[in-house]
Amino acid sequence: MLKLKVAIVGVSGAVGQEFLRVLDQRNFPMDELVLFGSSRSAGRVYTFRGKQYTVKELKHNDDFKGIDVAFVSAGGGTSKEFEKTITKHGTVMIDNSSAFRMDEDVPLVVPEVNPEDALNRPRGVIANPNCTTIQMVVALKAIENLSHIKRVHVSTYQAASGAGATAMAELVKQYEQLLKGEEPTVEKFAYQLAYNVIPHVDVFTENGYTKEEMKMYNETRKIMHSDIEVSATCVRVPVMRAHSESTWVETERPISVEEARKAFAEAEGVVLQDEPANKDYPMPLFVADHDPVYVGRIRKDISNPNGLTFWTVSDQIKKGAALNAVQIAEYLLKVGNIK
């Protein structure tokens, strides 16, 4: 089997570390690994498959010559600055930031939904969608295969880790401070997250939606090549890891609960967990660190014959970031399009 030379850019971050775990867990075929980071991260040593690798500082040079694929999770500014440095020698850049997602000449890919889009990448860049979008479209694809989805209303319940490792630490610290009767530290979120939910993820735009909510609208339409209408409300909740979403869809024809269950059960990347009578439904507590999108609480909309409601939970650092990117590379390798 063809083995690749792989780079990870931003390896010291939460997603960068997840790249290492996912590549190992999936036995990704590679014979060389190069790690890149900022000047602060340069010199750090990480172990992968029993070998130690030292982080190199990301610079404008020829370090990417000979590298087949680069998994990049270093922020949009870094991605934009180093795009040509990474791709100029033919490296496929799979980027986890929002920098290129809506660029017409950059494919936005979820392998369970639109893998072929990854083959058309004139700039050598493939964008990883936002974590909330990935989770939703994997589930939507199963319903879209039954009947065209006209519109979606979705509310998200997003874990603290979606804002980074320091956000998780702040949530833990807040609980500790409050239990001691101390004033909680509030730096990473607009308000105290402990014992609270915050209907505010990313910054607000002129139309009243946040950037996170608009990502779900714009990205879903691009990925699904659809005129689908999406209205999202994104909420931060005091959960450590794994996002949840309550999703309502309106389809062109009525879809029964039985049809939907069968479609989800057979869908790629989905696990059906829908036995409410036995208190069996997806929850972040049990989904964290798992690969699939879990779907449950499937029910007909009692006010709209063409409406269907369901609940999804997925690990946003895995499927919502690192795993999706690695699956893109696996697809390119499978069809012989990576080298």
Residue ranges of predicted features:
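N-terminal Rossmann-like NAD(P) cofactor-binding subdomain of oxidoreductases
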Residues: M1-L193, E229, V293-Y294, I298-S303, ...
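Charged docking surfaces used in two-component/phosphorelay signaling
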Residues: A70, A160-K339
